[in-house]
């Protein structure tokens, strides 16, 4: 499924920079590649920066489809297959928000790196650099995954202004106040 859901020309490289674009038949030869197509998410990938790859059992979560483990450090990526969710500008915002809520709830339970999904690449399953374990081929519905966690309801713009993290000039404080107000207006108009 990784090969069929990957883009035809995924980004790939020998490191996390994803500097090359190759056909997927060649991209799987690189240790890092783009597994989700642009504009679609078919895999929820969790980056575990600890050595407990089986933490999903202790957390009471369903088994991932794939576990891709680093041979040296023991860190791993957990891959959960889901039906493709469109993330383009033409997509509906509710399914995207639902997918993000499920992802964040799983990431919290798995003690996963929450900054991981910002990049396009992940470890390539089956590459010789990694130990890859395929547990099953089941494709999880988002509702099925959501049954295992409590979804937090949060605003899309965060927790509000963090005045301790900005400089104390009046311009920065004014910007922090206004940007959250603007986010609420934009969200209401969508």
What does each model-found stretch correspond to?
Residues 83-88, 145-190:
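Modules that initiate DNA replication and primer synthesis
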Residues 7, 13, 25, 135, ...:
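Generic low-complexity, intrinsically disordered sequence content enriched
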Residues 43, 56, 129-130, 157:
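A residue-identity detector for tryptophan
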Residues 100-145, 150:
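Flexible helix-coil linker/hinge segments at domain or subdomain boundaries
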Residues 1-76, 82-97, 116:
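Signature for HUH/AEP ssDNA processing cores
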Residues 68-72, 93-104, 174-189:
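A signal for specific C-terminal beta-sheet/loop modules enriched in small/flexible residues
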Residues 61, 107-115, 183, 187:
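Generic surface-pattern signal
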């Amino acid at each position: 499924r990784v090969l069929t859901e990957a883009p035809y020309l995924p980004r790939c490289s020998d490191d996390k920079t994803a500097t090359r674009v190759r056909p997927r038949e060649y991209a799987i030869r690189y240790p890092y590649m783009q597994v989700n197509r642009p504009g679609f998410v078919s895999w929820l990938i969790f980056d575990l920066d600890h050595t407990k790859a089986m933490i999903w059992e202790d957390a009471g979560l369903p088994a991932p489809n794939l576990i891709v483990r680093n041979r040296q450090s023991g860190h791993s990526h957990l891959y959960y297959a889901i039906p493709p969710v469109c993330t383009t500008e033409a997509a509906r915002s509710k399914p995207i928000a639902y997918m993000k809520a499920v992802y964040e709830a799983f990431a919290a339970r798995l003690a996963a790196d929450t900054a991981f999904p910002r990049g396009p690449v992940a470890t390539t399953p089956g590459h010789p650099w990694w130990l890859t374990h395929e547990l099953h081929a089941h494709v999880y519905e988002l509702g099925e995954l959501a049954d295992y966690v409590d979804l937090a309801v949060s605003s899309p713009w965060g927790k509000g202004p963090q005045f301790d993290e900005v400089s104390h000039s009046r311009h920065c404080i004014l910007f922090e106040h206004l940007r959250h107000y603007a986010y609420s207006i934009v969200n209401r108009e969508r």
